Structure formats: structure tokens, C-alpha cells
Amino acid sequence: MKICGISDIHGDLNINIPECDVLCICGDVINLNDQRDIPASKHWWETRFVKWVESLPCSKVIVIPGNHDFYLERMYNECWGWFKDHMSLLSNKKLEFLIDESFYYEDIHFYGTPWIEPISFQKNKWAFERDFNENPIEIPKCDVLLTHD
């Protein structure tokens, strides 16, 4: 199986993605100019990003959010199950989002977690911050671990 990994695209969809079975996008997907604008982010994800995903030379795209993906943090806090199903349907089931979740593709176990340790002088400024001392993450044994930190 051929797996490709990228991160920190910040809205730049003019990337040459090689042919692969699975593309893993490890955070900071949204354009920096729109990162805190929820309506603009929603529109971008549902139109530009989904169309880009459908055009990629791969069978599956797995996304974990990054510290600039505020829209995904909001969806996670408010309606994660609905959002994942909605995006999967929009992309003809090509797109999979992971937040502390496993996903199996052709017997390969992927696990994704987006959390970052708070930056001491900027606490609560970024999406998906988590104090690992107070709230540690239990990562299962997996074949491919996707993180942003």
C-alpha cells in the first residue's frame, strides 16, 4: 500500500499529490485568512476542499485537524458525528476525519489525534489545545499514527 502524508497546507490546494492509496493530511488545512471565520471556513470545506479531494489520485483521504483548524474544532464540539457523515457523503465516501479515533483501510490501522500542548505564553489561543499532564491521551497500538504536534 502506498501512503502519502502532508500537513500545513493552509488552504493551498495547488499541491502535486503523487498517486497513492491513502493521503493523510495532518492538520492546518484551512486558509490562514479564514481560519477564525466560521461561515467562510464552512463554505471552503464544503465546496473547494471537497472538490479538491475528489480530484486526487488516491482512494482515501484521512484528515486530522491542526491548531489553525478552528472550524473543525467547532464541529467537533457541536456536531462531530453529523459533520463526519456530511463530509463523507459530499466526497463520495473518499474523506475520513479522525479525532482520537481509529480507521481501518485494507487491514491497515490508522489512528489520528489532533491535540497540541498549549504554548505557555499563548494559552487558549489555538484550536485543539490540551494539557497532557491533566488530560493525557491514550493512543492504541496502530500501524499509522497521525498527529499535528
Describe the function of each predicted region.
Residues 20, 33-37, 75-76, 85, ...:
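Active-site-proximal loop/helix segment associated with metal-binding centers of metalloenzymes
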